[in-house]
Amino acid sequence: MSGNSCDKVQVRQVRKIGPTRRSVSGSYQFRGKEAIQYESTLERDFLIRHEFFPNIVSITPQPVEIPFIGDNGRAYTYTPDFLMSLRYLDGEATQHVLVEVKPRDLWVENWRAWSSKWKAARRFARNQGWSFKIYDESRIRDRALENIKFLDRYQRFAQAPGHTDTLLHALYKIGPLSRDALFAHCGVIAGDERPWAVAIWYLLATRRIDCDITLQLDGSTILWTHQNG
């Protein structure tokens, strides 16, 4: 898909989200820059999860209005929750995904009633060279989100430069290593692992090193730098 596919429509937030009594609404500071509005805790968790992945270029809330005809023959307008732009591994092309965030019990219960607007969203996305996906808890509140929330607390931990520099130097020099193998290479003494583990979590949280965030974080976790990943 071309990185220019967004040029076919004007992509911007078309609907502002106000306070709601039925769910939690607010704004999330995406990568410390733009504030992205959400209107449920599930939408907030979607933003937290996808902020971590470097291939996510941007997320636009309430991005487009899509006209559709309901089963009753009346005209309506549907606004998906987000437009997510992802960069392919080659770093050149960009993929765009229209996203609807919905709890599983709601979309299962209302699938037939909502099918007209979702079919319209798929048609609209296809015409733009995009795709349309529905995200429920199974795609958002997974192991990756648990790990991301666990690491978040370590972003603000003060680190001894000697620990982080030693770990980074080893990964730059040798390449991907498990956490246990990295500790062994750096001469970490048994019983003294705690500050070194905190340094690992800090480096992961601040994205100076990487791992497969979808897997459990433990001694077998493979770590690498962006240089040798």
Regions picked out by a protein language model, each given a short descriptive name:
Residues M1-G229:
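Electrostatic, structured charged patches in enzyme active sites and in nucleic-acid/phosphate-binding
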